[in-house]
Amino acid sequence: MAKKSMIAKQQRKAKFSTQAYTRCNICGRPHSVYRDFGLCRVCLRKMANEGLIPGMRKASW
């Protein structure tokens, strides 16, 4: 879980464009965030398995 101070810091507008970074919209995790969904891999997998993301399903081959 992300610290509240880091989440608040991330929500401010960055002074320079290179300082901006992505965080998960659900848990605030800074790493392995999918930009298309705005979710980290953990939350993306959980929501996909619960059927909360339309059109996404578990792969099987």
Curated annotation (Swiss-Prot):
GO biological process, any: translation
InterPro entries: Ribosomal_uS14, Ribosomal_uS14_bact, Ribosomal_uS14_CS, Ribosomal_uS14_sf
Keywords attached to this entry: Metal-binding, Ribonucleoprotein, Ribosomal protein, RNA-binding, rRNA-binding, Zinc
Residues noted as binding Zn(2+) in the record, renumbered to the chain: C24, C27, C40, C43
Cofactor note: Binds 1 zinc ion per subunit.
Superkingdom per UniProt: Bacteria
A GO cellular-component term linked to this record: cytoplasm
Cofactor: Zn(2+)
One annotated GO molecular function: structural constituent of ribosome
HAMAP family attached to this UniProt entry: Ribosomal_uS14_2_B
Subunit (UniProt): Part of the 30S ribosomal subunit. Contacts proteins S3 and S10.
Similarity comment: family membership: Belongs to the universal ribosomal protein uS14 family. Zinc-binding uS14 subfamily.
Role: Binds 16S rRNA, required for the assembly of 30S particles and may also be responsible for determining the conformation of the 16S rRNA at the A site.
Protein name: Small ribosomal subunit protein uS14
Protein source organism: Sulfurovum sp. (strain NBC37-1)
Gene this chain is encoded by: rpsZ
